[in-house]
Design a protein with these regions (language model features):
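Short acidic-aromatic low-complexity motifs
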Residues: 1-32
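A beta-strand edge to alpha-helix "cap/lid" segment located at domain peripheries
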Residues: 9, 15, 48, 52-130
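Residues at or immediately preceding the N-termini of alpha-helices
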Residues: 21-22, 44, 104
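Short, hydrophobic secondary-structure boundary micro-motifs
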Residues: 22-23, 36-37, 63-64, 110
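Residue-level detector of alpha-helical secondary structure
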Residues: 24-28, 46-53
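A short gly/proline-enriched turn/hairpin at secondary-structure junctions
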Residues: 31-43, 54-55
Length: 130
């Protein structure tokens, strides 16, 4: 099975402006995708609202994957997302992910917990801001 990973998915969603939001989402997430971030569930539409909001704030960044595990349809990782915002400020979030992959290799469900490593108090909810 060919499968996506968090680095490819987040890079396409946040940093690859050659892809529309829908193109990036369709590449990495199923139509019935759901996500739980720090205890708050979002369906695919709510998740895409969140990413659309981030695209208005973010000018660049990178995703560093420190651990990553695939086991059949299960996926887990620990990564740090480094973001540079349009105002020049930076945010770094460490994220712990557990996910289910669909048979086609796209994310079907993600549950994640975030820890801000760098940024202002206003950025603490950047992982779920809409």
């Amino acid at each position: 099975m060919t499968h996506t990973g968090i680095e490819a998915a987040l890079s396409d969603l946040l940093f690859n402006r050659d892809l529309t939001l829908d193109e990036a989402a369709d590449r990495h997430f199923t139509p019935d995708y759901r996500q739980r971030t720090d205890g708050e569930w979002a369906d695919r539409a709510e998740f895409l609202d969140h990413i659309a909001h981030l695209r208005t704030l973010v000018v660049g960044g990178k995703v560093e994957v420190h651990e990553e595990l695939y086991d059949g349809s299960k996926y887990a990782d620990r990564h740090i997302c480094h973001i540079t915002k349009k105002d020049g400020s930076t945010v770094s979030m460490e994220v712990y992910v557990f996910a289910d992959l669909a048979p086609d290799g796209r994310f079907q469900r993600i549950q994640e917990t975030t820890l801000m490593l760098e940024g202002s108090d206003a950025d603490r909810n950047i992982g779920s801001a809409r």
